[in-house]
Design a protein with these regions (language model features):
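N-terminal pre-domains immediately preceding structured catalytic cores
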Residues: 2-204
């Protein structure tokens, strides 16, 4: 699909949704295109999730994704949130906006787009759910009618880096924890604003 057609498709999806999103024209499934078939780098210990002080004006039970902080914040109470480390979009795949969780899947399957397979010919046409090299990992939260997801990963060493094609990538154990907390319909705000959230005295 050409870039203009992708742009038109993205605009059509946004117009059909009840939520405003500003996005670059890019296939959004969160896959680091050069992982499949490449040697895996030495993995560093996974950064943990932790409770932070969060702006008191935000009501609980909503998600803020800060691409600047490379954190996903699940607001648990006024002034408190759980901060999870994420991999953020590449510069050419950046987007911001407000969406809602439209569906949830355990062990989602993955179908790479034609452009992804052109960029990386090693990609298969389809990866079943539960496969150890499924880029969506063990859980996925689908955002509105877009291609954006909050999901796990088969490449945990990419967490903390700007590598995805638009999706919000998390460690599998973190997205599994988030999955059990977040119902369908949850508001998700994606932004490049930094919240500079700090750990409180007591940890989660």
């Amino acid at each position: 699909m050409s870039v203009p057609r992708l742009r038109r498709a993205a605009l059509a999806l946004a117009a059909a949704s009840a939520f405003a999103v500003t996005a670059q024209p890019a296939a959004a499934q969160g896959f680091f295109l050069f992982d499949w078939g490449s040697p895996q780098p030495t993995q560093q210990p996974a950064a943990d999730a932790y409770v932070v002080r969060f702006p008191h004006r935000f009501a609980p039970r909503q998600i803020f994704v800060s691409f600047a902080d490379r954190k996903l914040y699940w607001v648990t109470a006024r002034g408190r949130a759980i901060a999870y480390p994420i991999a953020s979009p590449r510069a050419q795949s950046s987007w911001t906006g407000v969406l809602r969780v439209s569906q949830k899947k355990v062990n989602p399957s993955w179908t790479p787009t034609a452009s992804m397979r052109r960029e990386n010919p090693r990609l298969p046409a389809f990866v079943p759910g539960g496969h150890p090299q499924n880029p969506l990992g063990n859980r996925a939260l689908y955002l509105g009618s877009t291609l954006y997801r909050i999901h796990g990963t088969d490449a945990p060493w990419t967490i903390g880096r700007p590598v995805s094609k638009g999706c919000v990538r998390m460690h599998n154990h973190h997205v599994a924890d988030l999955y059990r907390r977040v119902p369908v319909g949850t508001k998700v705000t994606a932004t490049y604003k930094s919240f500079r959230a700090r750990k409180p005295a007591a940890y989660w």
